[in-house]
Structure formats: structure tokens, C-alpha cells
Amino acid sequence: AWTAYDAALRGLKVAIIEQNDWASATSSASSKLIHGGLRYLETYDFKLVSKSLKERELLLQIAPHRVWPLQFGMPLYTYQRNHYLNRLKLKIGLMLYDWLAGKTRSKTHHRYLDAESLMTHFPYLRNNALKGSFIYSDAQTDDARLVLELIAGALDAGACCVNYCQFIQFLA
């Protein structure tokens, strides 16, 4: 849908065909997250993380009614093996994540909450052996609504958008 919208805005002839309803297949099974790829830091894929973070920021700017910040917490417990090493590893990873996002001075950079502070926000969290938690931000979307808006935009820009239709053959 996004590609159809973008291509139609550029004046190209565009047709998008969907066999079922818009956003009913892959989109409906998504996690609804617009994330920067924090887990890819473990495999040193800095280019992918940087690109994903830039795309996330772009979506937050151009579609704030459909993409919004969402905070995540990673609780740390003393019984976790190598919990001091894990804390250091997470700290370095989140600092790198913030840096790649270009948010070293932003309100959305990561932070650490000690166990007492964390329990005031999450009173039902298991607190025995809780050391604290790192909090960081990514984003969430209403993906089906976003797809529908993109289809509407593509239509307005001159694209041919058809759903409940099956593509059989391209005739030249």
C-alpha cells in the first residue's frame, strides 16, 4: 500500500490488487510494532538498526495518529545468571540504540529504574530478587488503519486499487 501510494504521488501509473480485504493477511498478523531492531545489535547489524530507527522516526512524524511511542521494560533479577554482566551489556546496547537513533538528548532515550521505583509503576511485577529495569522506547501502530489510509491516498493520487480480486495474467 505504501509503495502504491508513493508511486502514485510521483505520477506513475499504479494498480494494486488484493485477493482479500485490505490489510487482512500479513498485515493482520503483525506484532503491531514499529521497532528499531534492538535485537540486531547482538549480531552487529548496525546498518539495519540505524535504517530501522530512521524509518521509525519518520513514521512517528508523518503519521502520529497511527504510529505512537511505546515504552518497554526489561526487568533484571539477581538470580539471573551473570546479572551484573547482563546489566552492563544491556546498558551498552541501549546507549548504542539511542546513539543510532540520534536521540542522545531526547526524552525518549533509555533509562534505568531501580526496584523500588519500578514497583511504584508496576506493583504486580514479581519483586523478589528484582534489581531494577531498563526502560526504552519503540513505537506501535494500528497497521490496518494505516494501510487503509495509504490505499485511500493512493486512490486520491490516481492509483487503481482493487480488493477481493485475483490477478490471473498480465496482458501487454
Where are these regions (language model features)?
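Short amphipathic alpha-helical face segments that pack within enzyme cores
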Residues: 2, 6, 35-36, 145, ...
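Gly/Ala-rich phosphate-binding loop of Rossmann-like dinucleotide-binding domains
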Residues: 4, 8-9, 153-155
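Glycine-rich FAD pyrophosphate-binding loop
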Residues: 8-30
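Dinucleotide-binding Rossmann-like beta1-alpha1 core, especially the glycine-rich loop
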Residues: 32-121
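Conserved Rossmann-fold dehydrogenase catalytic segment
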Residues: 84, 128-136
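Flexible hinge/switch segments at interdomain interfaces of large molecular machines
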Residues: 122-128
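Helical element adjacent to the flavin cofactor pocket in flavoenzyme catalytic cores
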Residues: 134-172
